[in-house]
């Protein structure tokens, strides 16, 4: 037991009493200005009667303690101390009361300092962790860029060396061989053609002359021999010779006649042949004069040009040889540079190996950091509140609503309190101003992209394995469906895009996800499958197949029997699914809206993740709920089927408010929660309890004509916003 300070008496000196002087303490406290969160409290602010263990707690937390949250306690303390000081001598009971309050105040101060120190430590750890992750990512990107740059430089140098070698060889071969061969071929062909033609004609002429001369010589020799033989015979035997002469003469005459006849015919033939040959010779001469000589002149001219070109080529070859010499020197220099580059490459390869080892270690660290990130992200979301309420004000409809929206005033976000406030003015007999506070308020100029920047954190929680509910609440025509389902930037399309982007990022850390979805509506407390195959029929024709809600107590998961489940593999599939579901959703015309949604639509996304590297598993469910319009019956002016629809809608919305209110009670873990009062709350039972996260969008109209419905929606949202979930096992 802690000993109480003794009461001062007249016989004792007050210097030795354990009770501090209230006046001195109050003066000491007033003498200190307000400190920031990092300034430790002065020792004399902790009053002397507290125990030493409490004093140690306060000293350990000195670097992170703020006195600002204790103003009211200090004011109470001052008032109590002044009261006690004024009546100390006359009222010993008041002195005892003061002592008890001093101890309680010290205890409260110590606890408060300890809590704030813990909070600051957690914030510092979170900041350090983020800085480490950023530094690791920066180092990794720098190393990767250096590696790519070095590889590109090496490839460029190799390509330059290869191109220089190929160009050198091709130039040398082409210049040295091609031109020489071509010149030799031209000269040889010209000489060969001229020589061949000249030889052919000479041969023909000489052959003709030789044949004629030979023929005439042979005939003359033959005749001379015969004459000589006859002369010899005449000399030897005149008679015989005479006879023989006669015979010979007779025979000679015959032969002469035959020869003359033959000679004449042969002579005629020879003359004709000679004339023919002369004509051929003349034609050949003409051809030589007319054709071959000009060709020869052209060939000579071409030969001269080729010789000149050859000389020019020789000059170029000489220049190329000089250039080749220069290139050889450059190649030698390049080879030297390449050797140096190869040495650098070896060094870089070793560096890359070391870097790869470091990267492997970094990957392992990143995998661990992902687990830490999930934990810190969840703690951050819990600090912001497991139940959050955002308000969204849609723009006024042109030509349909009053453009004066001054009845609603939105204030700036308060960083100190972490909330944003708004005032709504209702003018009846007098102006009544109603103030509401929410976690975030989106004004008329804010877009769906701005909205999803806040929603994306909760979508991330579903990927981390938590159940998440996002509601769009408000009167008909307030923009709920636009917020949830607008193509391209609505919460549902943006959520799918966010999920697939993060799935691709997490693949590098070993995570593999399977994404399945269901799309249902709750119409008159009946579940309707919006993804059924008979999409031409507006009614759910699966008669005999009841849609029942079943809960698994062990795994804390919920299933709906006989509904269509689709495996999502791309963002494009979601567009098709949403178009199909919108065609089948129940809508009708009311006094508030021509196309009023008469049911609650729920887009359920199941996210099952596993990590092959760490063996970790996660399973989260994301419920995106577009609630039906929340207007009153006397405003919507409905009858018949529309009246029954409105009654069921208002009943389920009321049950949702009752469930959330019951979950926020201190004894909610022991008391009964009325989940079964509506199909909506029963379906979302495990997404509203435990570590689940809930976000409600209250959508309102800025028009003064809807001020009553706007106030009703804001009051309901304020009731939800005041709830703080208690974890239920």
UniProtKB/Swiss-Prot annotation:
GO terms for biological process: cell division; ERAD pathway; karyogamy involved in conjugation with cellular fusion; meiotic cell cycle; microtubule-based process; mitotic cell cycle; mitotic sister chromatid cohesion; mitotic spindle midzone assembly. Changing residue 632 to A: Decreases microtubule-activated ATPase activity. Residues 10-22 have a biased composition (Polar residues). ATP binds at residues 386, 388, 392, 454, 477-482, 554, 579, 694. Its EC number is 5.6.1.4. Residues 1-48 are annotated as: Disordered. It is found in: Cytoplasm, Cytoskeleton, Microtubule organizing center, Spindle pole body; Nucleus; Cytoplasm, Cytoskeleton; Chromosome. Disruption phenotype: Short mitotic metaphase spindles with splayed microtubules (MTs) increasing spindle width. Disrupts the poleward movement of kinetochores on MTs; abolishes poleward sliding along the lateral side of MTs and increases end-on pulling. During karyogamy, (the mating step where nuclei fuse), abolishes the formation of a MT bridge between the two nuclei thereby leading to a failure in nuclear fusion. Abnormal meiosis I; cells do not progress past prophase I, interhomolog recombination is abnormal and the organization of MTs is abnormal. Interacts with CIK1; the interaction is direct. Interacts with VIK1; the interaction is direct. KAR3 contains two globular domains separated by an alpha-helical coiled coil. The N-terminal portion of KAR3 contains a microtubule association domain distinct from the kinesin-like C-terminal domain. This is Kinesin-like protein KAR3. It comes from Saccharomyces cerevisiae (strain ATCC 204508 / S288c) (Baker's yeast).
